[in-house]
Amino acid sequence: MENSRVLSCQYRSSFGSSNARRIRAKSEIPAVVYGQGKDVSHLRIKSSEFNKKFAKFTDNTVLILDDGKLERCVFVKDAAENIASKLIYHIDFYEVDRNVELEKYVPIKLIGASIGVKEGGILTVLKEQVKVRSLPLDLPEFIELDLTPVNKGDSVLLKDLVLPSNVRLAENDENLEVVIIK
């Protein structure tokens, strides 16, 4: 397992706001895991480990929660952050089966300076995200679209996107335009 995705956790049997304050006082984050038709699990994670490994995370960031006995494949469903200190004080994780493909929307990240724009064309972005299908651990956080070769008057279609090998397009119409340069 890719170590950068693994997050150590400990299960907890006591919960509530006073218990959550005690957990935070120990520089830990109270959290819950739900999904897969299982009961909600309450746990705690070290805030230093979470902040170090996942300083920036998206809806598509896959984590592996490891309590020493069981590894659970999860997404961050919600993270409550203190506005003043910018510290995360509670996390909701959503568990998925790592062996079952899922469909998720992934942002399209535009890179490069288009030839068409350099010639005075106007770039119009029609889709900012694309629906893809993959196993959870293969899910990209974004899809890059290199605009460098796109000329004035050209467009890029969904089917033109370069996807990682284990990721497939899950959109109904692969001929939809992503960007146009007029």
UniProtKB/Swiss-Prot annotation:
Q: Which GO terms describe its biological process?
A: translation
Keywords in alphabetical order: Ribonucleoprotein, Ribosomal protein, RNA-binding, rRNA-binding
Extract the CDD domains matched here.
Ribosomal_L25_TL5_CTC (cd00495)
GO CC, sorted alphabetically, is: cytosolic large ribosomal subunit
| One annotated GO molecular function | structural constituent of ribosome
UniProt cross-references to SUPFAM superfamilies, sorted A to Z: Ribosomal protein L25-like
Q: Hey, which family's this protein in? A: Belongs to the bacterial ribosomal protein bL25 family. CTC subfamily.
| Entry-linked HAMAP family | Ribosomal_bL25_CTC
Q: What NCBIfam families has UniProt attached to this entry? A: bL25_bact_ctc (TIGR00731), PRK05618.3-1 (NF004135)
* Role noted for this protein: This is one of the proteins that binds to the 5S RNA in the ribosome where it forms part of the central protuberance.
Q: How does it assemble?
A: Part of the 50S ribosomal subunit; part of the 5S rRNA/L5/L18/L25 subcomplex. Contacts the 5S rRNA. Binds to the 5S rRNA independently of L5 and L18.
Name of the featured protein? Large ribosomal subunit protein bL25
Q: Which organism is it from?
A: Borreliella burgdorferi (strain ATCC 35210 / DSM 4680 / CIP 102532 / B31)
Q: What is the lineage of its organism?
A: Bacteria, Pseudomonadati, Spirochaetota, Spirochaetia, Spirochaetales
Question: What gene name does this entry carry?
Answer: rplY
